[in-house]
């Protein structure tokens, strides 16, 4: 009996001790009850915001509302032709560039870009006057329409393209644009068109560097936007350049110099005999011998060519008809 009483008494003491010291929460850190952290219930939900400190508050003042600001990027003429100068004189935006670049940047090319945008215009010599268009004023409030004037001026050393606003109307009411508006309108047109001519120049130069496309070329004698007779071709610039280079010598034109990127050739003409023209199926054109030039204009996958005399005047009349028919017969083979 003594052997059984001792273990039972010890077990009773352990059980009693364990029941007397039961904690209301688990304590797995073996801390003493007095040192264990206690938790309290949050009385209010969320975060308590401290009030604003008015120490540095600015005094209230009556501030007058200013005029609405035009946050659009400023439009100024940009000199994006090599060795050029661009400016706005208060009425006109212009870009002045070396005369040797006039075969790329000229009134004919400006007319072509207007045609591509379906902007109607009239032309006389080196001046263009457009019909009403919202070009350059699409972001204005209301319906703003403008009529532009584009001029090409120059001498042996330099040329310039000049853009001005002839008339302006907003919601069918004529108004006089402010100087800032004139600068924005004229600069937008000038920068956009010159930028596109730059892109055309680069694409033509790149096209000539690639292998020539072969295949038949369809042709037609047309009147271009400058009222000049021209030969239209169903071929891209590269193929037209190559075809014309082969055909022109057969008509008596010798190439003195050429600028591929501009689509320009300077030519010297010596008339062929009547027999040679008869073989081409046309009558001999009444053209004087001397200096001429050839200018290709690219129109996407099509192109056109104009031949001009040494004064820059496009050949016309029966002489132009005969010359372009002969060219068409040669390049369509």
From Swiss-Prot:
The keyword Lipoprotein applies. Residues 1-18 form the signal peptide. Keywords: Cell outer membrane, Lipoprotein, Membrane, Palmitate, Signal. Gene3D superfamilies: 3.30.530.50, Outer membrane protein assembly factor BamC (3.30.310.170). It comes from the Bacteria. A lipid is attached at residue 19 (N-palmitoyl cysteine). A lipid is attached at residue 19 (S-diacylglycerol cysteine). It is a lipid-anchor. GO terms for biological process: Gram-negative-bacterium-type cell outer membrane assembly; protein insertion into membrane. Its main location: membrane. InterPro entries: BamC, BamC_C, NlpB/DapX. It is found in: Cell outer membrane. GO terms for cellular component: cell outer membrane. Part of the outer membrane protein assembly complex, which is involved in assembly and insertion of beta-barrel proteins into the outer membrane. Part of the Bam complex. Belongs to the BamC family. This is Outer membrane protein assembly factor BamC. The gene is bamC.
């Amino acid at each position: 009996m003594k052997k059984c009483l001792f273990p039972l008494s010890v077990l009773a003491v352990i059980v009693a001790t364990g029941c007397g010291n039961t904690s209301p929460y688990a304590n797995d850190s073996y801390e003493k009850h007095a040192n264990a952290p206690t938790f309290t219930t949050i009385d209010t939900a969320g975060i308590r915001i401290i009030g604003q400190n008015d120490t540095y508050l600015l005094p209230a003042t009556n501030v007058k509302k200013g005029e609405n600001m035009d946050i659009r990027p400023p439009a100024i003429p940009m000199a994006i032709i090599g060795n050029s100068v661009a400016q706005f004189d208060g009425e006109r935006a212009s870009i002045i560039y070396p005369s040797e670049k006039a075969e790329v940047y000229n009134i004919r090319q400006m007319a072509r870009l207007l045609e591509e945008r379906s902007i109607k215009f009239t032309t006389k010599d080196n001046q263009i006057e457009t019909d009403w268009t919202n070009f350059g004023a699409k972001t204005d409030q209301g319906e703003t329409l403008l009529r532009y004037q584009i001029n090409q001026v120059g001498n042996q050393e330099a040329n310039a393209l000049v853009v001005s606003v002839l008339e302006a109307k907003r919601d069918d009411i004529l108004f006089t644009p402010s100087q800032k508006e004139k600068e924005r309108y004229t600069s937008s047109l000038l920068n956009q068109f010159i930028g596109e001519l730059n892109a055309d120049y680069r694409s033509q130069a790149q096209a000539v560097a690639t292998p020539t496309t072969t295949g038949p070329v369809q042709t037609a004698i047309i009147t271009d936007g400058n009222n000049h007779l021209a030969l239209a071709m169903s071929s891209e610039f590269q193929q037209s350049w190559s075809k014309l280079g082969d055909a022109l010598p057969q008509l008596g034109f010798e190439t003195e110099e050429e600028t591929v990127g501009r689509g320009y050739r300077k030519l010297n003409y010596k008339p062929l005999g009547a027999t040679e023209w008869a073989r081409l199926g046309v009558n001999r054109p009444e053209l004087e011998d001397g200096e001429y030039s050839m200018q290709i204009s690219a129109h996407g996958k099509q192109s056109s060519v104009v031949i001009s005399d040494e004064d820059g005047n496009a050949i016309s009349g029966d002489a132009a008809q005969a010359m372009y028919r002969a060219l068409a017969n040669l390049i369509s083979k």
